[in-house]
Amino acid sequence: MADWNPSLYLQYGAERTRPAAELLARIALDDVSDLLDLGCGPGNSTALLLKRWPLARITGVDNSPAMLEQARVAVPECRFIEADVRQFKPEHAVDLIYANASLQWVPDHYALLPHLISLLKLNGVLAVQMPDNVDEPSHVLMREVAYEQGYPNRAREPLPGIHAYYDILTETGCDVDIWRTTYYHKMSSHQAIIDWVSATGLRPWMQELSEHEQLKFLERYHELLVQQYPIQENGQILLAFPRLFFVARREP
């Protein structure tokens, strides 16, 4: 798959950073010496962590060279490593593992989450936020267009769900705070919705298509978006975007 586009991702930087800040606000840790930012992207979440814990040793981990290049410029005080989050292991146990809008791309959370918990110190915290929007029209319509035009399903798997996450985490010996929030982002047009998802959810669908095929796909996708997302009285469009959060503390 082609590398991520940091500029496109940060086109809606404020909207993407807000859930990161709200996840951070629910972490009840004062003294943090070592922490990981898994799937750190262009460093927007890493900057929040540095502001909260300026004396901590912060390591950002991502598998995108382009994102890491941007992150090193944005937050030069922190260390960044190119690695697969499933295989990366810190040199020693850490106080906090923070993963904002990244783990939804990683398969098999039933194995992944116990592994991540094992990397924490006792009383350490795993804090996670993930888009939970595969059943929203924005993503359902991608699958519909692919089916219409004869392309394979390249959608990511749905998240296991709140009850499954609660069981996975409590069975690994964690105290768990879990919640789900739906944001309503103001979009200026239906094309703006396409611009938003082009940086993330639409990427797998576009990767294997020719330029002509991409244009045909996006033209039909735009037609269906117009049918599903009404224009408000002031000309704006509200894009519903559910996100799932949890903060899990490893109990002694």
Swiss-Prot record:
It is found in: Cytoplasm. Its EC number is 2.1.1.144. It catalyses: trans-aconitate + S-adenosyl-L-methionine = (E)-3-(methoxycarbonyl)pent-2-enedioate + S-adenosyl-L-homocysteine. InterPro entries: Methyltransf_25 (IPR041698), SAM-dependent_MTases_sf (IPR029063), Trans-aconitate_MeTrfase (IPR023506), Trans_acon_MeTrfase_C (IPR023149). It is an enzyme of class 2 (transferase). One of its GO terms (biological process) is methylation. GO terms for cellular component: cytoplasm. Pfam families: Methyltransf_25. The keyword Ribonucleoprotein does not apply. GO terms for molecular function: trans-aconitate 2-methyltransferase activity. Keywords: Cytoplasm, Methyltransferase, S-adenosyl-L-methionine, Transferase. Belongs to the methyltransferase superfamily. Tam family. Catalyzes the S-adenosylmethionine monomethyl esterification of trans-aconitate. This is Trans-aconitate 2-methyltransferase.
